[in-house]
Amino acid sequence: MAINLATKYSDKIAEAFSHASYVRGKVSNEYDLSGVKSIKIYTPVTVDENDYQRSGVNRYGTPQEMQDTVQELTMTQDKAFSLTIDKGNNKDQMNVKGAGRMMQLQLREKTTPAADKYALRRFATLAGKVMTVSAKPTKSNIVSTIFDMGQIMDDAQVPEDNRYMYMTAEMYKLVNISDEFISLDKLGEKSISRGECGEVDNFRIIKVPTGYLPANCFMLATYKGSVLMPYKIQDAKIHQDPPGLSGNLLEGRHYYDCLGKYFKGCGIVCIGNEYLFHYSS
């Protein structure tokens, strides 16, 4: 891409709209991958109770060895970038490309969105329950659909706290103009942190840009304890006048991955049409 040299223009750069991560902070940090490339997560499997016998042997029942399910996570996302800011070009552009500021711009516009998109798409493919619908939710049924997703988690005894519902602005608009909205708390009054837009049925609503959720996925619900996004490397470096360059060299590397942890199969619930790609891991 060409570098446009400024002549009489403002020293401001029109930075594209960007956003902090929608996902990080809403995932579990229970596991540490320091020193390893893969981890195995063991989930114990409990047994049903039986009637106590007041005579005979094994009055509590026949002892059974506790079983478990095993999930393995292998780190696959090893991403990097490299940018140069030539000192001469920057001088001709009124020094508008400050290295630190350009690094932040790169992270906000490229690195963070790429990781968020990967995470949400990964979580959707690992959903324990997929609600298949023939058409997008409408203002007349979107709130009841959210409650249906909550019921799935309730029936699976997923804890009610730390539940999140990711949806596009299109779906969020439908919630706001829905018939049931008048009986709900005003979503805007419950905003807690960047990206959160209130609550419906114990779900903290996270409004994400179009393209973050996988194609044909209308909403994605997660329980924090069921989704992992471990990072092993988060490097962002600025080299001033490195060999072979008069100017700054910006480099970054991010090594991470995502996993949906079993929580009775329903710590992740998504709704989409029949074309939504899904598999159970």
Locate each region found by the language model.
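Structured, hydrophobic secondary-structure cores that serve as assembly/anchoring elements
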Residues: T46, G61-P63, T69-V70, M75-V96, ...
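Solvent-exposed loop and beta-edge segments used for protein-protein assembly and interaction
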Residues: L33, A99, Q157-P159, G244
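Sequence/fold signature of self-assembling virion shell proteins
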Residues: A2-N50, T69-Q77, S82, M94, ...
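Short Gly/aromatic-enriched secondary-structure transition segments
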Residues: R54-T62
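Alpha-helical scaffold segments that mediate packing/assembly in large oligomeric complexes
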Residues: N89-A156, I268-S281
